[in-house]
Amino acid sequence: MIMSIYKEEYKNVIAVTNRKLSSRPFLEQMKRVCKLHPRAVILREKDLSEEEYAELAVQILTLCKQYQVPCMLHTYLETARKLQHPYIHLPLFLLRENSENPGDFLAVGCSVHSVEEAKEAQKLGATYLTAGHIYTTDC
């Protein structure tokens, strides 16, 4: 009964990763997250090189598949293509740069911080949006 309550509670949550914030080993923490069955996971590890990201992505995709949690890869279009993964999430500047070429994905997400950005992302082909903070950050 308790687990079904958790599943219900997290069914609309999109978990965005930052392994530096986890006090547990990252894969252990991700297993705990996946067991709660969030709506999706966005693997957002901005400090990794594309090669490092690809290695981590393989592990996280396996874990997400095991728990039937959709996983959106973040930023690295070529990694997603090489892994034949159908979901990508892009910052708006990358969606702008690749608006002609994201068509091979089932879902293209975009992070937006204003209504104007949301409208632009939709015009550029985003199939879903995440709305974040509206103040300046380093991302």
Functional labels for PLM-detected ranges:
Residues 1-89, 93-95, 102-127:
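Conserved N-terminal beta1-alpha1 strand-loop-helix module at the mouth
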Residues 127-134:
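Non-cysteine beta-strand/loop elements that form the S-adenosyl-L-methionine
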Residues 43, 135-139:
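A short acidic, helix-capping loop that chelates divalent metal ions and anchors anionic groups
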